[in-house]
A protein has these predicted regions:
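Hydrophobic alpha-helical and helix-loop surface patches within well-folded domains
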Residues: 108, 138-286
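Composition- and surface-driven signal marking solvent-exposed, interaction-prone regions
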Residues: 3-5, 61-64, 122, 221-227
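Hydrophobic beta-strand segments of well-ordered beta-sheets in folded domains
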Residues: 47, 136-137
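Extended, low-hydrophobicity, Ser/Thr/Pro/Gly-biased non-transmembrane segments
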Residues: 1-117
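Extracellular/periplasmic catalytic domains that process cell-envelope and extracellular macromolecules
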Residues: 38-41, 99-102, 130-131, 168-170, ...
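Reverse-transcriptase-like RNA-dependent polymerase core
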Residues: 117-134
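Helix N-cap / beta->alpha transition motif
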Residues: 52, 71, 121, 139-142
Length: 286
């Protein structure tokens, strides 16, 4: 958790006891979760999360009691487009006043997933974009709204590209959340930054939904199928959606604006990694 503009923010990850996976290769897996790779059993989750009534919550799975906790009238007030002209990092407005005696319970149901995560924040505002019967929701802290307007659209584009080229996404939604992080969990990604710099992060975390999310492979045993494959997917999506070159902020420095050359996505996301590892004397295990 952390605090911004006087409001508490919560990311609920690795928050409950998990049973070791028993698989055909290793039997009971004994790798300890040390804040990095993880491996879980597929199952059904029914989770009820109770927060103060001013919190907006999203999580793995289907929101069962949407009409109760997020009725249409409130959803319209929270729509990200309403805050398109909000000054960056300015004080958020109050949509739902805090009352210490009022609580809401958000009920999520998820089937055939191997983990459950959630995010909650009173300043979240909601964007939405669809591809076929899939939906990408963006949860954006209101002070960041002006530079997150295309997050849901970009996320839906990633779903389209990955589904058409690598096998269709099996779940009904994916979340991209403005959560000062860079991690993936079934149906939900916790992200940071702003457009256009966050594009590679969003593509990367959504890309994790393929091997990590839907197949649920042992990341410790086959690390290449986790970060390695996902880094390839990141470059693939950026090239398909934005073209050969990375979209970057306009250079305000005179020298850079005159001589700077944009990076190719394949270089930035794939090839330069080897250079960085060599110069930092790092050689990650694949």
């Amino acid at each position: 958790s952390y605090e911004s503009w006087g409001y508490k923010h919560y990311n609920g990850v690795h928050w409950y006891p998990r049973i070791s996976v028993y698989d055909s290769k290793f039997g009971w897996t004994k790798d300890q979760h040390l804040g990095r790779e993880f491996y879980g059993n597929f199952g059904t989750f029914d989770v009820k999360l109770t927060f103060a009534s001013n919190f907006i919550v999203e999580a793995t799975g289907n929101l069962v009691n949407r009409s109760e906790v997020l009725p249409d009238e409130l959803r319209e007030k929270l729509d990200l487009k309403n805050f398109a002209n909000k000054k960056w990092n300015s004080e958020p407005s109050v949509i739902i006043p805090y009352n210490k005696n009022n609580r809401k319970t958000w009920y999520f149901h998820a089937e055939n997933v191997h983990d459950f995560a959630f995010t909650a924040d009173p300043t979240y505002r909601i964007g939405e974009a669809r591809w076929k019967d899939k939906v990408c929701y963006s949860l954006v802290q209101e002070p960041h709204a002006s530079r997150w307007l295309n997050a849901a659209d970009f996320g839906a584009e990633c779903l389209k590209v990955f589904s058409e080229d690598f096998g269709e996404y099996v779940y009904h939604k994916v979340i991209v959340a403005d959560a000062q992080d860079g991690m993936e969990y079934p149906m939900i990604t916790l992200d940071r930054g702003s457009d256009p710099g966050y594009r590679d992060l969003l593509a990367h975390e959504i890309g994790h939904m393929w091997f990590f999310g839907q197949i649920g492979n042992n990341e410790t045993y086959r690390a290449l199928l986790d970060e390695g494959f996902t880094q390839f997917l990141t470059a693939w999506a950026l090239i398909k959606i934005d073209g050969e070159f990375m979209i970057e902020n306009k250079k305000t420095n005179w020298y850079k604006s005159k001589f700077y050359k944009p990076f190719k996505a394949i270089d930035s996301e794939i090839y330069y990694s080897y250079i960085k590892d060599a110069t930092k004397q790092k050689d990650p295990v694949l």
